Design a protein with these regions (language model features):
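Core dinuclear metal-dependent hydrolase active-site scaffold
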Residues: 1-49, 53-62, 125-177, 245-251
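Short glycine-/acidic-enriched loop or helix-start segments at secondary-structure transitions
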Residues: 15, 58-60, 81-83, 108-109, ...
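Short, glycine/charged-enriched secondary-structure capping and boundary segments
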Residues: 18-20, 62-64, 84-88, 111-113, ...
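Active-site metal-binding motif and surrounding structural segment of the metallo-beta-lactamase
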Residues: 44-99, 182-184
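Active-site neighborhood of phospho(di)ester-bond hydrolases with catalytic His/Asp-centered motifs
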Residues: 48-52, 68-76, 98-100, 163-168, ...
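Active-site neighborhood of divalent metal-dependent phosphoester bond hydrolases
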Residues: 91-93, 103-128
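Binuclear metal-ion centers of metallo-dependent hydrolases, dominated by the metallo-beta-lactamase
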Residues: 172-251
Length: 251
């Protein structure tokens, strides 16, 4: 199973508009971060996790092939703002979208023309599905993982020995048990140490990682305050890394 990190940035992306810090002015391409998203491929099957406002740019860099399903972690714009750009992929067939009830309602409210009885030509053909327990989508067996983004319940996902969690500030013990011992974990870390009300930091993520004990960890959903990619890589434990846009790995 191949995983591609399409975007590794937080809601503002990196560089942040108007900022002249060393990260935002870095010439290292790993310090350039589009909004967070991941593409999972196994054989001919392709699964997208989140579809933010940078989706079009992200997919112009990839081979144009069918997307079998989309998993949404939650309703915020940086994770759903690119759904309309699924239009070209709908030429290859309708695209099922899986999300929790709150996100399903949000998508219907912001893209009403996709779900009206009378549709004009060219709109994306999206099929919304409310997640209720484990399910299959796009040829993958998927286990939803409930986490909290501040007070907002959102979803992470386990797919085989891989788990993807973003925007998390807290996870309940029974949900943590579902991903203990996995091979590869992608998890959010907004910045290195300064606490935030609805996103965990690298230091806070260490506690979760020590419970899960994955073989390898990639941090995602990072802001410019994370620090320079090259510098932070040197101080992380050997099995932990900052993800970067375009990173590919296999599970």
């Amino acid at each position: 199973m191949k995983i591609t990190i399409l975007g590794s940035g937080t809601s503002t992306g990196v560089p942040e508009i108007g900022c002249g810090c060393e990260v935002c002015t870095s010439t290292d391409p790993r310090d350039f971060r589009l909004r967070s998203s991941a593409l999972i491929e196994k054989g001919d099957n392709r699964l997208l996790i989140d579809c933010g406002p940078d989706f079009r740019i992200q997919m112009l860099k990839r081979p144009f092939r069918k997307i079998d399903a989309v998993l949404l972690t939650h309703k915020h714009y940086d994770h759903t703002g690119g759904l309309d750009d699924l239009r070209p992929f709908c030429r290859k067939g309708d695209i099922p979208i899986y999300a929790n009830e709150d996100t399903v309602k949000h998508v219907k409210s912001v893209l009403p023309y996709c779900f009206s009885d009378v549709k004009y030509p060219g709109i994306p053909n999206l099929m919304l599905h409310k997640i209720d327990g484990n399910f299959q989508a796009g040829g993958f067996d998927i286990q939803p993982i409930r986490v909290f983004h501040g007070r907002l319940p959102i979803l992470g996902y386990r797919i085989e020995a891989f788990a993807y969690i973003t925007d998390m500030s807290f996870i309940e013990p029974e949900e943590l048990d579902k991903i203990k011992g996995i091979d590869t974990l992608v998890i959010n870390a907004l910045r290195f140490s300064k606490p935030h009300g609805s996103h965990q930091t690298v230091l806070e993520a260490y506690n979760v990682i020590n419970e899960i004990k994955p073989r390898v960890v990639y941090f995602t959903h990072m802001m410019h305050h994370i620090g320079l990619h090259a510098k932070i890589e040197k101080i992380l434990p050997d099995n932990m890394h900052l993800a970067y846009d375009g990173l590919e790995f296999y599970v």
